[in-house]
Amino acid sequence: MLPFLFFSTLFSSIFTEAQKQYWVCNSSDASISYTYCDKMQYPISINVNPCIELKRSKGLLHIFYIPRRDLKQLYFNLYITVNTMNLPKRKEVICRGSDDDYSFCRALKGETVNTTISFSFKGIKFSKGKYKCVVEAISGSPEEMLFCLEFVILHQPNSN
């Protein structure tokens, strides 16, 4: 009995359940999905229309989220990995508290954020490979993590 308890305790962290993967979209050259990287797994819905093509693509990013805190001060910590190379951490301030670019920056705790943001990759050339981006959303004073998502983009450019 003692060996069973010992080994089950020792190996319990090795045999953990896999994270549920949420599919965002597929395009002719990319596949995009995400998983939660925190234990909260606070519901968020992300949609891209049209799906990202990493060759001079533009489109709309749709986000549906009910924040657990006011979004007067919001920033993202971005941890990006290209294939196996880790890029330096990037802090992207989204909401400063005044003169903000996005309407959701004034959203209060519990209010629905249902927003659409345009994007463009014009002039950026992405190499073939696996891109990972961990996004930590931090808000408030004192700072608190709202959510953490790990995006995976598999880029397989067409040889045409």
UniProtKB/Swiss-Prot annotation:
The keyword Glycoprotein applies. SMART domains: ML (SM00737). One of its GO terms (cellular component) is extracellular region. It is found in: Secreted, Extracellular space; Secreted. One of its GO terms (molecular function) is coreceptor activity. Transmembrane segments: none annotated. Residues 119-123 are annotated as: Interaction with lipopolysaccharide. Keywords: Disulfide bond, Glycoprotein, Immunity, Inflammatory response, Innate immunity, Secreted, Signal. One of its GO terms (biological process) is cellular response to lipopolysaccharide. Changing residue 95 to Y: Abolishes LPS-response. InterPro entries: Ig_E-set, LY96, ML_dom. Its main location: secreted. Glycans are attached at residues 26, 114. Residues 1-18 form the signal peptide. Heterogeneous homomer formed from homodimers; disulfide-linked. Belongs to the lipopolysaccharide (LPS) receptor, a multi-protein complex containing at least CD14, LY96 and TLR4. Binds to the extracellular domains of TLR2 and TLR4. Ligand binding induces interaction with TLR4 and oligomerization of the complex. Binds bacterial lipopolysaccharide (LPS). Cooperates with TLR4 in the innate immune response to bacterial lipopolysaccharide (LPS), and with TLR2 in the response to cell wall components from Gram-positive and Gram-negative bacteria. Enhances TLR4-dependent activation of NF-kappa-B. Cells expressing both LY96 and TLR4, but not TLR4 alone, respond to LPS. This is Lymphocyte antigen 96.
